[in-house]
Amino acid sequence: GISAVAQMSYYDKEQKDKYLAEAVRQFLQFADRMFIPEKGLYRHGWVESSSDHPAFCWARANGWAMLTACELLDVLPEDYPQRAKVMDYFRAHVRGVTALQSGEGLWHQLLDRNDSYLETSATAIYVYCLAHAINKGWIDAIAYGPVTHLGWHAVAGKINAEGQVEGTCVGTGMAFDPAFYYYRPVNVYAAHGYGPVLWAGAEMIRLLKNQYPQMNDSAVQYYQVKQKTTAPIFAIDTEEKKD
């Protein structure tokens, strides 16, 4: 895949330029076909022989796309000619995905369909990517830190007493109807959830070493410097005023 090709640039210095060019070419061709600009999301599949393509925005597929962009940006030199274009796709995708986070912190199996179930593995991938992007300075901690924090809190709540990750969709191919995605089973033995949860946890540790989240009333606010007080900037006065 694209990530593997990009990573090869680390190990074969003589062929580094070739591998980077191929990884970027694949990413941009993928995005050109799969990214839906008006949604800020990736479709799950694309059929070359069809004029109309399925537009089901499966959560974990969007996770893999976001993770691929992260891994590509990690290895592309700052002055690489097409780095800015890859970054533009990444940031547009971040905006599209974060706008659809549920109030519980998880994301839905079909991202833009709130009646589809909440899914753990995709959420863990997003948490990793968002935390990583904040740590790298690609996106703003003030805007995206609280979303990331909420996502991690939700993911952590899906780890049961046996250390199993609950709520992970099993392997899923492309489909042409929504019911297929709605009724895909979840299973604690679906391995897709474990790696992302470990990655997300490790990146959150790094994030919390670099940023200083603080409760402000009932909202999480992210600060780049440690605050002198733990008292909220504002709070709701719940006491009744007496005449």
Give the label of every model feature segment.
Residues I2-Q15, W64-Q82, I125-I139, P196-Q211:
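Well-ordered alpha-helical scaffold segments within catalytic/enzyme domains
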Residues K16, L20, R83, M87, ...:
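Flexible, glycine- and charge-enriched loops at secondary-structure boundaries
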Residues D17-C70:
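Loop-centered beta-sheet repeat module
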Residues L20-R43, M87-G105, V147-Q164, Q221-F234:
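Long, well-ordered core segments of solenoidal/helical folds
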Residues G40-E48, Q109, G171-D177:
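Conserved catalytic-core motifs characterized by acidic clusters
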Residues E48-L67, E78, Q82, V86, ...:
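Solvent-exposed loop and edge beta-strand segments that line ligand/cofactor-binding
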Residues R113, Y117-L118, A124-K242:
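CBM-like carbohydrate-recognition segments
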